[in-house]
Amino acid sequence: MSADANPDLKSADIGLIQQILPHRYPFLLVDKVVDIDGYQSARGIKNVTMNEPHFQGHFPGTPIMPGVTIVEAMAQTSGVMLGVGMDLIGTDMLIYFMNIDKCKFRRKVVPGDVLEMHVETVRGKPGGKIFKFSGRATVDGELAAEAEFTAMIDRDGKDG
């Protein structure tokens, strides 16, 4: 598998995302990934709607997207970026959180918002197992959340 096997592929729609990530409703938290630059950077898009199950309890009458789901959306964006950038489309790849650092929440994310997840690879190489990412989530250009996170890539879904 080559790190530049898809050099012209700069975006992933929901169909391609589902070929890369094992997540499905209600835990698939990215609708589209654009501006993919190999395995180095990408921008995910999540259209936040009232139909999401977490809004039933977080919080009744005042729906706010849970911060942990924002961080997960950044991680899923990173997974799609790696899947495209390292030619792991249609494989059994799994990515596991190992660490989350410097996580801060700056504004509420509510139904009707378009959440953009901007992710960059800080450390990690094609063929490697451990990757560190920097992520920022924005709504209308305003910072909603930020975090650094480390993940392990399991290319065949057997390393756990």
Curated annotation (Swiss-Prot):
<dbReference type="GO" id="GO:0005737">
    <property type="term" value="C:cytoplasm"/>
</dbReference>
<keyword id="KW-0444">Lipid biosynthesis</keyword>
<dbReference type="GO" id="GO:0006633">
    <property type="term" value="P:fatty acid biosynthetic process"/>
</dbReference>
<comment type="similarity">
    <text>Belongs to the thioester dehydratase family. FabZ subfamily.</text>
</comment>
<dbReference type="Pfam" id="PF07977">
    <property type="entry name" value="FabA"/>
</dbReference>
<dbReference type="GO" id="GO:0009245">
    <property type="term" value="P:lipid A biosynthetic process"/>
</dbReference>
<protein>
    <recommendedName>
        <fullName>3-hydroxyacyl-[acyl-carrier-protein] dehydratase FabZ</fullName>
        <ecNumber>4.2.1.59</ecNumber>
    </recommendedName>
</protein>
<comment type="function">
    <text>Involved in unsaturated fatty acids biosynthesis. Catalyzes the dehydration of short chain beta-hydroxyacyl-ACPs and long chain saturated and unsaturated beta-hydroxyacyl-ACPs.</text>
</comment>
<dbReference type="GO" id="GO:0019171">
    <property type="term" value="F:(3R)-hydroxyacyl-[acyl-carrier-protein] dehydratase activity"/>
</dbReference>
<keyword id="KW-0456">Lyase</keyword>
<feature type="active site">
    <location>
        <position position="58"/>
    </location>
</feature>
<dbReference type="InterPro" id="IPR029069">
    <property type="entry name" value="HotDog_dom_sf"/>
</dbReference>
<dbReference type="GO" id="GO:0016020">
    <property type="term" value="C:membrane"/>
</dbReference>
<keyword id="KW-0441">Lipid A biosynthesis</keyword>
<dbReference type="InterPro" id="IPR010084">
    <property type="entry name" value="FabZ"/>
</dbReference>
<dbReference type="InterPro" id="IPR013114">
    <property type="entry name" value="FabA_FabZ"/>
</dbReference>
<keyword id="KW-0443">Lipid metabolism</keyword>
<keyword id="KW-0963">Cytoplasm</keyword>
